[in-house]
Amino acid sequence: MLSDAAKALLALKSLGRHQSGSEILASPEKLSALLSLSTLYKDDPDASSEALRCIANALLLIQSSRETFLKPPVNGGEICLNALEKSTNPEQIFVLARILFLSTALLPDYIVTFIENKHNGRPVVEIIGAKLDLLYICVLNSTRMAKEAMTDLLKFAYNFIHHYPKAVQENPQSQAAEEDEKKVLGDYWSPKLDGLLPPLLRIFGSLPPSFPNPITPPLTHVIHALIGIPVSPSLKNVWFPSRSAVNSPKSAPQTPHSDHRSDSRCGSPIMQSPPPSARPGAFDRALSVLSAGRRSFSRCSSPHVSSNSDILHRAWDLLEVAFNHFFADNIDPDDPKVRELLKDSSDNSLDALLSPLVILITRLCQADETSRARLKQWLVPDDLDRESPLEQRQDMFGKSLRLLTSVYHNRLKDSVGEMLYAMAGSDASNLSTLIGYGNAAGFLFNKGILSAPPASSSTNGDVASSVRDDINPITGTTFKPKPNLPEMTEEEKEQEVEKLLWLFDRLEKTGAMPADQNPIRKAIQDGKATLGP
């Protein structure tokens, strides 16, 4: 049963769900009082949680209260970070993460303060990493509020990835970042955030997928965070640990930050990712991950989740399962049935749901030659059957090509185009060689490449191995021998000419074609053709 304090704070929270109620709670005095109550009733989790939920409601409804909460005399950000560092209860972590996410979403200056200072002697990045590893174990054990807590903690982490590098502008990731005054995600990076990458990769590589759509929270928020972290030379051994482990016999899988606190609610399984091997079906691979996660409950007293996983393999598996769910067989991506499947999703468009995962794969391929070669072999293997139109295939290659002509899913269309372009080494000629210029033309036109690219002298061996002399450069399919048809008779030729004359005359009369652009009229005026014998 709830204590009297919990009941009173529950009633206060109910009043704070309305704008007028939250306006009263948003004053410095009320926010400080609620923080004090959450600390005073630390041995009463229900009462402490209700006090924090009152604050969360006020921050959500009264935007001006967010800065009030962070600055003196409240100093709520520091108090909540210290509480987060100590907490092992998913319900309390959820509310604390929600408060910290809301209070820092639009205030990047305080993000800098959080990064530069330590909290209970620990950097905030280390605290977030430890809590993510703890919550991963809780998610595997289906602990109440574990998924929600991880989702909001990931949102809080994303605020750091989004705001801090732009605020300090330490390491520009491209020439455009230095020249463009408008800074966007990925233009800059700070080594102080490097510690976020290992726990994010551990969760991305091991979190059991959902079915039939595998891209659901908190996995969606992991992907959003990952695409904001550069695949830079200094971080490549973290992005691709299995590769560095092979190259360096002394290297070992990186362990997560130990929290030195255990909670019987969560358990603490060990989760090891197997090395990449032959590729079974995507659905079978996803099921095996889910089964492995369930078998691993409560094996030890401290979380140990290996980050030695294949990030590209995992991302491609998830995309393959998602594409097979939304674009079954060879359905048109713009078919209304596709949009019907989104009714059960938290996202209202495939652009928002799938584009981030495609962007993650693209960034891996842009930064890593091995990833490009692997993606090419999965999408366009050397022994690809090119007898039938490529865009009619039922596999991932065909689905990707059909998306290039989508009208309804513009962001996803562009993202898939960039992924194919990265797979081809960011070379228009290589892309046209692999998928046919007819399939690539629309994407290349939007990139400012307005004509068919010439054969590239830099075509790499992987692309060259996919090219055969009998492949049509426009369709990407093999040439078919022309049937031996009899020559047209003179009478048939005259009939075809009459059809052309009639068509062009009709276009001219309807105003669709100016008279001076009629090719038949021009030919007659130039003496190159006559109307009759």
What does each model-identified segment do?
Residues 1, 126-148, 166-184, 195-217, ...:
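Acidic, Ser/Thr- and Gly/Pro-rich intrinsically disordered linkers and low-complexity segments
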Residues 1-151, 162-194, 232-245, 305-308, ...:
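Elongated alpha-helical scaffolds that mediate protein-protein interactions in large eukaryotic proteins
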Residues 2-13, 42-60, 86-108, 140-165, ...:
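Alpha-helical solenoid repeats of the armadillo/HEAT superfamily
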Residues 132, 327, 379, 448, ...:
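Generic secondary-structure transition motif, activating predominantly at the C-termini of alpha-helices
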Residues 195-201, 208, 248-251, 255-310, ...:
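Long, compositionally biased acidic/polar linker segments
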Residues 263-483:
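Eukaryotic scaffolding regions of large macromolecular assemblies
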